[in-house]
């Protein structure tokens, strides 16, 4: 992936999401008669600044990791008598709640807009047809077979593997029954299968829901002919060349690239013997595999790839919506992803999901770059998901976040008077500690994935 895509994708993502979030606060504050002193995108040294006719200073700062809206407030500085009514602290509790809630709400509205555009643009999806089912796996025990096409998971229709994965992610760490409706191969007959779950993937790092059921999606065969080599990878170091065809690994014949991938991933750090066909001659090559990940996520890495192949037209479907249908899709996806984000947080707190699944700025930058390089639709999807995460996280009742301020104002509304400044200060200290701790944990997780 190009570093340029990563940098540009990250800057665009943060710039758009932060600006929209802060604009929510700004717009409602203005409507409530609060004087806004500064609207800043980023922190630190201002790179660009200007003032509008209301005296608000607009700033684009050097560190693009957030932003803020500074409002007139007697608690922060002395306010001239003629401006007292424009102070944030002089507004009613309802007005203050509206101003604070407007930021996260803006993020949800932005996600709806992005999902609406994606639905209008349409996408080409691979039909979720099962390629193979591992013996004795959860899928095999439920009676699922190769050639069946998944139609719905837990009653939710699915049109592609992304939809399947989303529905499975919702069940991580749970016990019970997963209902899968499929269409039998070569017929229009539907059947429903019950997959038994028992603390499914509870606490697992980087879970792969589809693979863990024992399902491998159908895909065209890929001959194991090398078309890509990592200049610093084990394959290059061992002397493999573009055009080499792998015939066996440790004496086990391979005729499809997926066999190579499975074999390599299962041997992290091991030395393997390859038989390679090159220019009509069979060569023996010893190769020491690298290691990616840690713990249960450890896997072997070879540093080689093959060329893609054309998918049969019957295995692809175009999915798009009209303007009104797209609105429904956008609302539904935003609601679903918001609930999924909240559910994931709950499961992490209960230990049903590993905290190692938390991602920080490095992972965000990588995904931003990859999605930007992949196309407009993928990048807009990424922005929508990130905007939802920003909205949900900001609504958590943790002092220092918008949700913490909302909690204070709700308590004030119920009590008829605000909490003491000492209690609020304690809350802020606790909130800052929690937020910094989570940010450090996410950064450590990012670094462990490098």
Swiss-Prot record:
Record keywords, A-Z: Cell inner membrane, Cell membrane, Hydrolase, Membrane, Metal-binding, Metalloprotease, Protease, Transmembrane, Transmembrane helix, Zinc
Coiled-coil residue spans: none
Domain PDZ: 199-291
Places the protein is found: Cell inner membrane
Primary localisation category: membrane
One GO MF term: metalloendopeptidase activity
Enzyme's top EC category: hydrolase
UniProt membrane topology term: Multi-pass membrane protein
Known EC number: 3.4.24.-
GO biological process terms, semicolon-separated: proteolysis
Active site (UniProt): 22
Chain positions recorded as Zn(2+) binding sites: 21, 25
Superkingdom of origin: Bacteria
Residues that span the membrane, as ranges: 97-119, 425-444
Cited InterPro entries: PDZ, PDZ_6, PDZ_sf, Pept_M50_Zn, Peptidase_M50
GO cellular component, one term: plasma membrane
Cofactor requirements of the protein: Zn(2+)
Record bears the keyword Protein biosynthesis: no
Family: Belongs to the peptidase M50B family.
Name of protein: Putative zinc metalloprotease PA3649
Organism: Pseudomonas aeruginosa (strain ATCC 15692 / DSM 22644 / CIP 104116 / JCM 14847 / LMG 12228 / 1C / PRS 101 / PAO1)
